[in-house]
């Protein structure tokens, strides 16, 4: 019984994964995502996407662990932007 339930869940998961990852011949999904992002009307929402960045030799946290990122063109070395 448990094996049957696991098989059903696995088949449903793989079916959903296949449908989500399927390539749309006319890029229908890609166009919807780009359109909704480009036509965003709320200016406050765009402010939320901007993050403060750390300049060279300033303290940073690895992006996976924290919220302080290095400015464009720099990478977070061992706890400082280089």
Swiss-Prot record:
Maturation propeptide residues: 23-49
UniProt subcellular location: Secreted
One Gene Ontology molecular-function label: ion channel inhibitor activity
Coiled coil (residue ranges): none
Disulfide topology: 53-71, 60-76, 70-81
UniProtKB keywords: Cleavage on pair of basic residues, Disulfide bond, Ion channel impairing toxin, Knottin, Neurotoxin, Secreted, Signal, Toxin, Voltage-gated sodium channel impairing toxin
Expression across tissues: Expressed by the venom duct.
Domain of life assignment: Eukaryota
Primary localization: secreted
Pfam families: Conotoxin
GO cellular component: extracellular region
Signal peptide: 1-22
Family membership: Belongs to the conotoxin O1 superfamily.
Domain notes: The presence of a 'disulfide through disulfide knot' structurally defines this protein as a knottin.
Functional note: MuO-conotoxins are gating-modifier toxins that inhibit sodium current by trapping the domain II voltage sensor in the closed position to prevent opening of the sodium channel. This toxin has a preference for Nav1.4/SCN4A over Nav1.2/SCN2A sodium channels. It blocks Nav channels by interacting mainly with the C-terminal part of the pore loop of domain-3. It also blocks fast-inactivating calcium current. Blocks Nav1.8/SCN10A sodium channels and has potent and long-lasting local anesthetic effects.
Miscellaneous remark of the record: This peptide was under preclinical trial by Cognetix Inc under the name CGX-1002 as a local anesthetic agent.
Protein name (database record): Mu-conotoxin MrVIB
Source organism: Conus marmoreus (Marble cone)
């Amino acid at each position: 019984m448990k094996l049957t339930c696991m098989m059903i869940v696995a088949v449903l998961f793989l079916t959903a994964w296949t449908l989500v990852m399927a390539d749309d011949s006319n890029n229908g999904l890609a166009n919807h995502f780009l359109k909704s992002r480009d036509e965003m009307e709320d200016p406050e929402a765009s402010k939320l996407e901007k993050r403060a960045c750390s300049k060279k030799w300033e303290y940073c946290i690895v992006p996976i662990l924290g919220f302080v990122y290095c400015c464009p063109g720099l990478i977070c070395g061992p706890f400082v932007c280089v």
